[in-house]
Each structure stands twice: as structure tokens, then as C-alpha cells.
Amino acid sequence: LLEAATAALARSPGASMAQVAQAAGLARATLYRHFSTRQELFAAMRAEALVRAAEAITASRLDEGTPLEGLRRAVEALASLGVRFRALIVEGADLDATFLQQRAEVLAPLQAVVRRGQEAGLIRSDLPPEWVVIAMASMLVAAVRASADTGFGDGQVADLVFGTLTSGITPRP
């Protein structure tokens, strides 16, 4: 049910609950039995997005290869998730303190790989790892928002974000 609603909202982020139910092939009553309001649906989507992001980061094998290769894999995985959960980005998230703490925990492995890259001389050491991860996440959000207008797919979003990120974080000659 949540998967179907998420997919429907990815295609049409501003859809009403009735439109989400119809697009997902569900009866409106079925959707409302599980999520009585759009806010409840979005809260469930936020929780699911965090779980999926943690899984994607783990699956990115951050410790394999160079730190930049690990970051590249993470950006690719997170770009795909961003497109999938586009409605959360387009609508803006209701970011309470609990969500922000959970998001920080999910993103912590990325800060660790940035530190490893700094120690290896592959990432500028004058940039706080937290800032590099914030910049990466912000670019992903911006790229996913723009993808609806530009037609950029997951791969293009990942390429643009990673290219922009690495040109800013790698050591200057």
C-alpha cells in the first residue's frame, strides 16, 4: 500500500488522497483506513525513506575501493531514492527533531567515508565532513526537484551531483 502510494506521488507529488488511491489502484476507503490524512501518509513515507536510505548507503559498500568510489555509489543509490520519494522533496518535509536525528544517524557513514578520503588526500581537509555531506544532500534535493522539469533520470541526477560535488571537494592543484 505504501509502495503504491509512494509511486503514485512520485509521478504526481501534488495529488490528492483520492487521486493517490486511484493512481495506486486502491479504493479510497482502503487508503483512508491506513492513512486518515495526507500528513499521516507523508509521515509513513518519511519513515520508509529513512529506512531505504540507510539500506542504500549500506549497499553502497563505502569501504570498498577509494572513498570517492564509495561516495559515487552512495550518490547513485540516493539519487534513485530521491526520485522515488520525490513527493517528500517537492512538498517539503515536516522535519521534526526526531526525523532530523534519525537522518543524521543514517548519513553518519557518509561522513566517515569523507574523513577517510581526507586522510587519503582525496578530499580537501579544510572542509568539515559534515559540510561535505550536507552539500551532497542539498544538491541531491535540488537535482531531484529539478528533474521533473528537466527530465533528468536517476543516472543523470547522480552524474550531475557527483560531478559538481567532486569538483568542489577534491584538492586543488
Which ranges hold each PLM region?
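Key DNA-contact positions within bacterial/archaeal DNA-binding proteins
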Residues: 29
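HTH DNA-binding helix-turn interface
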Residues: 8-14, 32-42
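Short, amphipathic alpha-helix enriched in basic
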Residues: 1-23
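Hydrophobic/aromatic-rich alpha-helical bundle segments in the mid-to-C-terminal region
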Residues: 89-92, 97-100, 104, 119-164, ...
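Residue-level detection of the helix-turn-helix DNA-binding "recognition helix"
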Residues: 22, 36-37, 47
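Hydrophobic alpha-helical connector segments
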Residues: 44, 51, 55-83, 94-98
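Residue-level preference for short helical/loop micro-motifs built around acidic side chains
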Residues: 19, 39-40, 69
